[in-house]
């Protein structure tokens, strides 16, 4: 008989084992929670110094008694500069709308850099004119002082720093004085006639529709090449399909310069990177081209022995002979005038023609003024052109609406004080930047009722001078560093508009074009601008 098999009841042990497994599982879970908590604490310890570094300066203006426009942690007050999703004009507009009328200025941050945003036009006038000695430099000039590799940009008075800008401005400006432009007026008169002939040929071939951006830059390239270097650029004589070197290089040069201005602002979070990366506003290729063009033009003029022609090239020769100006000095002066006369004048002409096409009543009123002054003549002399008051008003109103340079940024060069109110003032330290938002002034209904309407009559009876004196209207800036090319630009715009409107009616297409802001600074017409030009005969 087999012995009975021994059996043991494990159920109590299983019960304890299950509990033990549960306890072990809970222990693991608890350890995970502890590790996660430690990781979060460590992350906070790592992030906190970064956060404090990015935000500790946000009290900068509050400590100094200036109201602060709340900045974002990393992006500052103008996030579009880094994200590239909005235009600087729109970022400034939000702050301007919130604080204008309440404060003369507010504190802002360009990424991490503190800056003063002017909201009161009278304060803008103080910075640009009455207290200019404390704000001599611009943001770009403070950089170019060290960028010795960008030699021609450094020779432009617009970007020059310290005391050099005054000498450069004096030498460059003497060649575009009112008396000198009067003597050289035939260049613009002949250029206007060539423009009319070119347009007549083009409208016949293209069913009256012309891409106006190209048209405007062809004209400014022609008159600037003739005036500065004494050459025919061929922009109004060669077929459109043939490439033109002067216009091609001028467009490449100015496009690069304005792109670098945008990039320059975007890198303000790390200013040292500009010098490390050797930022330059003028590309090497165009530097070489315009250097050779200046050299060859001087050689041709000397070889021809023509000392009677009054233009900018003859002025450059005088600087070389009388002031021992170097070749680089001459190229720098030539490019200074080219920048004013080619790109900014071409863009201003484009917008003026579009606004006239959009406002036929204004266009007709201007045409009547032009034709009445011409009487039986087919052209206007310099004095008659200068006497056209409504033409000048049209140009000013176009410049107000387009605001090609929407803001000016000045740098404090001497310690000074800004009066914020009757009882409060702000000490401004050397190196502090101050932005003047002239686009916002130009589009403020407090100063310009119906600001988006095109009304040249706003500038009737010399209102232009009064608005400038109050710091409200600043298309050319103001003060000692006001754009020196104003007479040149006005002559170029007036001559072109007179020749176009005395021979063509400008008509807008079906769709209205709206100036847009890309990721840069301005709010201007983008892409092709196709307008209809209907020829009529007087």
Swiss-Prot record:
Native organism: Drosophila melanogaster (Fruit fly)
Record: residues binding heme? 483
What is a GO molecular function of this protein?
heme binding
Its lineage reads:
Eukaryota, Metazoa, Ecdysozoa, Arthropoda, Hexapoda
**Residue ranges crossing the lipid bilayer per the database entry:** none
The name this protein carries in UniProt is Probable cytochrome P450 309a2
Q: Which gene encodes it?
A: Cyp309a2
- Give the family from UniProt: Belongs to the cytochrome P450 family.
Localization recorded for this chain is:
Endoplasmic reticulum membrane; Microsome membrane
* Keywords from the named record: Endoplasmic reticulum, Heme, Iron, Membrane, Metal-binding, Microsome, Monooxygenase, Oxidoreductase
């Amino acid at each position: 008989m087999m012995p009975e098999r021994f059996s043991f009841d494990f159920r109590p042990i299983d019960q304890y084992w299950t509990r033990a497994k549960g306890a072990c599982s809970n222990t693991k879970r608890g350890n995970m929670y502890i590790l996660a908590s430690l990781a979060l604490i460590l992350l906070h310890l790592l992030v906190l110094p970064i956060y404090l570094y990015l935000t500790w300066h946000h009290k900068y203006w509050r400590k100094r008694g200036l109201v602060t426009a709340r900045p974002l942690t990393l992006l500052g007050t103008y996030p579009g500069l880094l994200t590239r999703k909005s235009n600087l004009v729109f970022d400034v507009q939000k702050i301007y709308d919130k604080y204008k009328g309440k404060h003369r200025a507010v504190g802002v941050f360009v990424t991490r850099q503190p800056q003063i945003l002017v909201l009161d036009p009278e304060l803008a006038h103080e910075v640009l004119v009455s207290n200019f000695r404390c704000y001599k430099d611009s943001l770009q000039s403070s950089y170019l002082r060290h960028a010795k590799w960008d030699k021609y940009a450094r020779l432009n008075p617009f970007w020059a720093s310290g005391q050099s800008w005054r000498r450069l401005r004096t030498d460059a400006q003497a060649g575009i004085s009112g008396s000198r432009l009067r003597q050289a007026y035939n260049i613009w008169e002949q250029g206007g006639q060539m423009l009319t002939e070119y347009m007549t040929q083009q409208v016949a071939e293209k069913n009256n529709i012309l891409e106006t951006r190209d048209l405007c830059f062809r004209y400014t390239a022609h008159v600037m090449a003739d005036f500065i270097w004494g050459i025919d650029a061929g922009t109004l004589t060669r077929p459109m399909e043939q490439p033109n070197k002067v216009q091609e290089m001028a467009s490449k040069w100015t496009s690069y310069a304005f792109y670098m201005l945008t990039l320059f602002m975007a890198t303000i979070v790390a200013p040292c990177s500009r010098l490390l990366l050797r930022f330059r506003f003028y590309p090497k290729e165009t530097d070489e081209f315009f250097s050779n063009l200046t050299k060859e033009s001087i050689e041709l003029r000397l070889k021809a022995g023509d000392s009677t022609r009054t233009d900018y090239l003859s002025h450059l020769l005088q600087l070389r002979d009388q002031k021992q100006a170097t070749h680089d000095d001459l190229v720098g002066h030539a490019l200074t005038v080219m920048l004013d006369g080619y790109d900014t004048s071409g863009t201003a002409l484009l917008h003026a023609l579009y606004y006239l096409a959009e406002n036929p009543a204004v266009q007709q009123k201007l045409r009547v003024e032009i034709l009445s002054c011409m009487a039986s003549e087919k052209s206007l002399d310099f004095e008659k052109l200068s006497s056209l008051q409504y033409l000048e008003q049209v140009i000013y109103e176009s410049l107000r609406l387009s605001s090609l340079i929407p803001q000016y940024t000045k740098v404090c060069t001497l310690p000074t004080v800004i009066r914020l109110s009757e009882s409060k003032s702000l000490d401004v330290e050397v190196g502090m930047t101050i932005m003047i938002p002239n686009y916002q002034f130009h589009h403020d209904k407090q100063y310009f009722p119906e600001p988006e309407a095109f009304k040249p009559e706003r500038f009737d009876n010399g209102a232009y001078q009064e608005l400038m004196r109050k710091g409200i209207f600043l298309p050319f800036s103001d003060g000692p560093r006001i754009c020196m090319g104003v007479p040149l630009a006005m002559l170029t715009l007036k001559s072109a508009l007179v020749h176009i409107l005395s021979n063509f009616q400008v008509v807008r297409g079906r769709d209205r074009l709206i100036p847009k802001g890309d990721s840069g600074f301005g709010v201007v017409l983008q892409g092709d601008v196709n307008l209809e030009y209907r020829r009529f005969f007087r």
